[in-house]
């Protein structure tokens, strides 16, 4: 294909967001409508966000899904996830609370499936998105973006301090395979 020689808009695939997609729910989990959700690294199943869940934050549940009954298996139900969208979450407390003075674009970390905080708590919390202001009721506006949050989480897990841009690039390549 040749380079463009005049204005032309490419076809859009999905648009700029928000995106919705259905993911399988982990057996033993109950996802509430509005829960911040994590996709587990080991199985690909979705669970409500918690600091203990190993995986990436993927978005917010559009409806409830309950797989806590005996005899249920991974993926018996799916939950629709909304992502790359702005959501309002409960603000953290004390030194972890956001305020109007917080800079737009600051990282936001999850503390549970409905609460966010300003710090990673020594990397115990995962990044879930970016700060976009405060609501009048004190809730925090967060742009939930799993791709960018995953990059931040990997970079924060690096144990060395790269000496150069080349070393940083090597770390990123190693982290993402």
Report each predicted region and the residues it spans.
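Surface-exposed, low-hydrophobicity beta-strand/loop segments enriched in small/polar/acidic residues
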Residues: 1-177
């Amino acid at each position: 294909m040749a380079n463009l020689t005049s204005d032309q808009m490419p076809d859009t695939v999905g648009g700029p967001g928000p995106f919705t997609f259905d993911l399988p729910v982990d057996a033993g989990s109950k996802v509430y409508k509005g829960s911040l959700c994590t996709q587990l690294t080991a199985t690909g199943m979705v669970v409500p966000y918690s600091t203990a869940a190993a995986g990436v934050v993927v978005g917010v549940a559009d409806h409830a899904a309950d797989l806590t009954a005996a005899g249920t298996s991974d993926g018996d139900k799916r939950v629709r996830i909304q992502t790359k969208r702005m959501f309002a979450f409960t603000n953290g407390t004390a030194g972890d609370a956001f305020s109007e003075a917080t800079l737009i674009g600051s990282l936001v970390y999850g503390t549970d499936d409905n609460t966010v905080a300003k710090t990673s708590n020594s990397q115990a919390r995962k990044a879930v998105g970016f700060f976009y202001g405060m609501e009048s009721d004190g809730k925090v506006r967060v742009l939930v973006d799993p791709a960018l949050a995953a990059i931040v989480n990997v970079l924060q897990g690096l144990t060395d301090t790269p000496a150069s841009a080349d070393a940083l690039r090597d770390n990123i390549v190693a982290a993402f395979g």
